[in-house]
C-alpha cells in the first residue's frame, strides 16, 4: 500500500506592524511616525552616559507629565526586550540627534558608530498613543491631517530640578473647537503614562509662547478662528534640559520621529 503524505507548509506569520515599522527604519526609511503602526506605543529617547543616569531618572520622577518612563536599558545594552524582542535602539528610529556639550552635532539615521558601553537608554511615553484614542472618538488631529510633525514649544513652566537637569517644560499643541477640547481633556486623562491631560488650554502667551506659528520643534499648523490651542506636556523636554545641562555626550530621537514599540496603546489607559 502506498501512503501519500501531504506536505505541510508552515507559513511565517507577518510581523507586527510595529516591527515592520522598525525594520523599515532600520533599512533607512525616514519620516514622521505620527499615525504609524496604529495601536502600538511610541516613545521618546534619551540616551545618556551612566554617570548621569541616576540624576536623569530622578528628573523623570519629579516631572512625570513630560517624562513618563516606559522603558530603560541596562548599561551599555542597545536592547530593551520588554518593548520589543528584536528592538535595537541604535538602528530602529527614523532619525536621531547626537549631542556634544549641549549642542546637536549630527542627525544620523543610525547611531551604531556613536554607541558606547557606558550608555543608558530611557524611553519616555509619547502623545501619539493618546492620539489614537482621540481619533477613535472622531476628533480631528491637525498635524496628522496635514502629514506634518506635531508643533512643539518651549514654555515658561519650570521643571523640577535633579542634578544637572533643569529647565522649562516643552509642550505639544493640537487645536480643537472648545467642545472637543473638553472631550480631549477627558480622554487623555486616562493616559498618564503618555503625558495624560493637557497642561494648558488657550492663550499661548500665558505659558511663554510668543508666536504659535513658530514652534521650537516640529511644524506649524493652523488654528482656526473657532478653535483653541490645547497644550500637552511633551517628551521632547529632555532635549531642552540636555541643551541646558551641556552634557558632554547624549543621543536623542529627532522630534516627531519616535521609537515604535510592541506595547499596545490600550495598556497605557488606567480607566
UniProtKB/Swiss-Prot annotation:
Top-rank taxon: Bacteria
Pfam family name, one: D-Glu_cyclase
Keywords from the UniProt entry: Lyase
Keyword field contains Nucleotidyltransferase: no
Name of the featured protein: Putative hydro-lyase blr2921
Family the entry assigns: Belongs to the D-glutamate cyclase family.
InterPro entries: D-Glu_cyclase (IPR009906), Putative_hydro-lyase (IPR038021), UPF0317 (IPR016938)
Endpoints of the signal sequence: none
EC number: 4.2.1.-
Coiled coil: none
GO molecular function per UniProt: lyase activity
Amino acid at each position: 500500500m502506498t501512503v501519500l503524505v501531504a506536505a505541510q507548509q508552515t507559513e511565517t506569520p507577518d510581523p507586527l506592524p510595529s516591527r515592520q515599522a522598525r525594520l523599515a527604519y532600520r533599512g533607512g526609511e525616514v519620516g514622521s511616525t505620527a499615525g504609524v503602526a496604529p495601536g502600538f506605543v511610541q516613545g521618546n529617547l534619551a540616551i545618556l552616559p551612566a554617570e548621569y543616569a541616576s540624576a536623569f531618572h530622578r528628573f523623570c520622577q519629579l516631572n512625570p507629565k513630560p517624562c513618563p518612563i516606559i522603558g530603560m536599558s541596562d548599561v551599555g545594552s542597545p536592547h530593551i526586550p520588554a518593548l520589543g524582542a528584536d528592538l535595537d535602539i541604535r538602528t530602529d528610529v527614523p532619525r536621531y540627534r547626537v549631542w556634544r556639550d549641549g549642542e546637536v552635532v549630527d542627525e544620523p539615521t543610525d547611531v551604531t558608530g556613536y554607541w558606547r558601553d557606558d550608555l543608558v537608554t530611557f524611553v519616555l511615553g509619547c502623545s501619539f498613543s493618546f492620539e489614537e484614542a482621540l481619533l477613535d472618538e472622531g476628533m480631528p488631529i491637525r498635524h496628522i491631517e496635514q502629514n506634518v510633525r506635531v508643533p512643539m514649544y518651549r514654555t515658561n513652566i519650570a521643571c523640577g530640578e535633579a542634578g544637572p537637569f533643569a529647565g522649562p517644560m516643552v509642550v505639544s499643541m493640537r487645536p480643537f473647537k472648545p467642545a472637543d477640547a473638553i472631550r480631549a481633556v477627558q480622554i487623555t486623562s486616562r493616559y498618564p503614562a503618555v503625558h495624560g491631560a493637557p497642561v494648558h488650554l488657550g492663550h499661548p502667551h500665558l505659558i511663554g509662547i510668543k508666536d504659535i506659528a513658530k514652534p521650537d520643534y516640529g511644524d506649524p499648523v493652523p488654528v482656526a478662528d473657532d478653535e483653541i490651542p490645547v497644550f500637552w506636556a511633551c517628551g521632547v523636554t529632555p532635549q531642552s534640559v540636555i541643551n541646558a545641562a551641556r552634557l558632554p555626550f547624549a543621543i536623542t530621537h529627532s522630534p516627531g520621529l519616535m521609537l515604535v514599540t510592541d506595547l499596545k496603546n490600550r495598556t497605557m489607559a488606567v480607566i
